[in-house]
Swiss-Prot record:
Protein name: Centromere protein K
Protein's job: Component of the CENPA-HI complex, a centromeric complex involved in assembly of kinetochore proteins, mitotic progression and chromosome segregation.
Highest taxon in the source lineage: Eukaryota
Top-level taxonomy: Eukaryota, Metazoa, Chordata, Craniata, Vertebrata
Coiled-coil positions: 84-173
Places the protein is found: Nucleus; Chromosome, Centromere; Chromosome, Centromere, Kinetochore
GO CC aspect terms: inner kinetochore; nucleus
Family per record: Belongs to the CENP-K/MCM22 family.
Main location: nucleus
Cysteine pairings via disulfide bonds: none
Length: 260
């Protein structure tokens, strides 16, 4: 027999030790059964049985108090096998945690896209009301039309207020999940070795710049990228389909025209 024990022999040794421990437990159980089987008066049977069990448990308790914890086996191969099994359990738990984090990231991306879609819809509605307002200014306003105009104006104010709340909610969402990158390499994108520039802007500001450009000059919606645009944020927006590059100039980007 060689000095080293194969994993199969280690398992067999571990099983033998477990069987020995089980036999000792069976002996203790047999002793308890014999104690419980002693004849007692029928009237005191339950009390005597309970007292016997109490004494047995108390004796077992004192015995365990005197014992020190023991390893199941001192065989290095057995301990190595048990350690490998424990590592496999830890690995599975970590894989489950990783899967949960990935699902959460996907959910955050979906929430961002949904918030952007809601914002674009409100921009469309606001632009439609602005067009109606301009057309009505060119016409002769009658009393009835004044009332309609006032109602539309109130609705437009409500939409502006709703847009403001929506922008605030979007800003809070982006600040929570996409904060400004920290210096000294503490940014979210660890694969970027260089530190972020001093004047880097948030992802919320990037979207606001692109949105203002699209609304003010829809015929020229592109914005030139400078050092204040942090590359990881640009990649995230490009991968999500929220931002598009200029077909001829990669340094210029625009907001996706979701309303078209």
């Amino acid at each position: 027999m060689s000095d080293s024990v194969c994993p199969i022999d280690a398992k067999e040794e571990l099983l033998r030790e477990c069987e020995n421990i089980w036999k000792e437990m069976e002996k203790c159980q047999s002793k308890l059964t014999l104690l419980a089987a002693e004849p007692v008066p029928e009237s005191d049977a339950k009390v005597s049985l309970l007292l016997t069990r109490m004494q047995a448990l108390r004796a077992e308790y004192h015995q365990w108090q005197k014992r020190n914890p023991e390893l199941i086996s001192t065989n290095p191969e057995v301990l190595l096998l048990l350690g490998e099994e424990e590592l496999q359990k830890v690995k599975k738990e970590l894989e489950m945690v990783l899967s949960a984090v990935q699902l959460k990231n996907e959910k955050l991306k979906e929430d961002l896209e949904r918030e952007q879609q809601w914002h674009d819809e409100q921009v469309q509605i606001l632009n439609a009301f602005k067009e109606i307002e301009e057309e009505m200014k060119k016409e002769v306003v009658t009393d009835s039309e004044k009332r309609v105009f006032q109602e539309l104006k109130n609705q437009m104010l409500e939409l502006k207020e709703y847009k403001k709340k929506l922008m605030n909610a979007l800003g809070e969402f982006l600040e929570e999940h996409f904060p400004l990158p920290e210096k000294n390499g503490n940014a979210k994108k660890k694969r970027y070795s260089e530190e972020p520039p001093e004047q880097v802007i948030t992802i919320h500001e990037i979207l606001e710049i692109l949105l203002n450009q699209l609304m003010s000059t829809p015929h020229e919606p592109y914005v030139t990228v400078d050092d204040s645009f942090w590359p990881p944020y640009l990649e995230l927006l490009l991968r999500s389909g929220i931002v598009l590059r200029h077909p001829e100039d990669p340094n210029r980007i625009r907001l996706e025209a979701f309303h078209e």
